[in-house]
Amino acid sequence: MARGKNRSSKRHTPSKRAAASRAAEVPADRGSDLARSIPWWKSKPYLAALAAIVVIATGLIGGLALFAVEGGLPLPEALGIERARPALAFVGSEACANCHQTETALWKQSQHKHAMQHASAASVLGDFNDASFDYYGVHSRFFKKDNNFFVETDGPDGKLAAFQVKYTFGIDPLQQYLIEFPDGRIQALSIAWDSRPKDQGGQRWFHLYPDEEIKHDDPLHWTKLNQNWNFMCAECHSTGVQKNYDAAGDRFHTNWSEISVGCEACHGKGSRHVHWADRQRSWWPFDRDEDPLRGLTVFLNEREGVTWQVDPKTGNPLRSVAPAAIRREVETCGLCHARRGQFSEDWTPGRWLSDSHVVSPLARGLYHADGQMRDEVYNYGSFKQSRMFAAGVTCSDCHEPHAAKHRVEGDGVCLQCHAADKYEVASHSQHEGVTPKVTCASCHMPVST
């Protein structure tokens, strides 16, 4: 019995090979049912079609992008379509820093950046530790109170009074202090701080008119019109200044976009340039803006592609490209580096300075006979009548505009263009072995103020 039972069990248990064979044998009708059970979006034909569409679209977009870059695709400007651009507005120097890091770092160390600041422990250089200064019988005192800075001096009525210092003006070689009055006037104190090192005669209080007694009723007194910041100084020490003088109320409501001389003081309102830069980063070619000015009010690119070639015979340089009729850079710098009077507030960077200001011409007492500066005329007038200007030299050939310093120190700035073997020799300077060394500027740009 046991033997038969074992035989029966063996007969009904399928072998592994047979089981595998039967599992592989799927009837045709059951295969169709399985195919129909796969969702259509997972089917091979659909996936193949989708892949083809992606490839075609990628190729089309890439082709359009390449076509646009190569200049073949008509962008909106070419079709006469005016792009929507933001209104011109000031955005502040910090908006420029992300893209222009090198220029920003130089500017932050410049006098432009420190042309005007809020009075604080970080910005005030003068001695306000109960220091005093005497001037024609007026005993002025400089002190601090509640973290604010004060000066006790003669006021508009000639009587001693304490005035809070609201702003600082400049850093080197002197610093002045501004005091705000209730009617919106901001006045520049005539007692200034000599910020030079002590061994150079600095670190002291001094009066701007040491040899004249300026009384309270004198137009030059610090409380009068000639020392008024709103009228005399604001345009060049701050950015985007609106004087907002109320003639009926004889008050000022002056404001600015930036307290010191920022990027937009020279480059103009920056909103459209920021918009242009954002569009240039777009992957879609139609977003790119082909504005030749890059959204700027003025494009200060006069030195691009320009070289100075020195004539070996004379040692003098020649400009590789003739200068433009209007030197946008010179006119822009001239706004603050000229002796002039303002008659209109609609000047923008790059425009002729004479469109909005009366520039002091050659006048007796202002210039030396050879055209060099004699009085406080700054640089514009003297430079525009020079041979250098006529030859095509512009401000940034010698000055790095963001650092506001010479591109090379000493005679090196002149030797960028003038051959050393012709000019840095005793036969030219007529000063062999002189100590201290006589520089080019000693004769050609002497300092008198």
Task: Give short role names for the model-derived ranges.
Residues 200-201, 232-238:
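Long, basic N-terminal domains or extensions that often function
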Residues 224-226:
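Exposed beta-sheet edge/beta-hairpin loop segments within beta-rich domains
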Residues 60-74:
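Hydrophobic single-pass membrane-insertion segments
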Residues 50-63:
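Hydrophobic membrane-insertion alpha-helices, especially the h-region
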Residues 36-50:
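Short, low-complexity patches enriched in S/T/P/G
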Residues 1-37:
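N-terminal intrinsically disordered, acidic low-complexity segments at the extreme N-terminus
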Residues 4, 71-80, 84-87, 102-170, ...:
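Primarily the internal scaffold of c-type cytochrome electron-transfer domains
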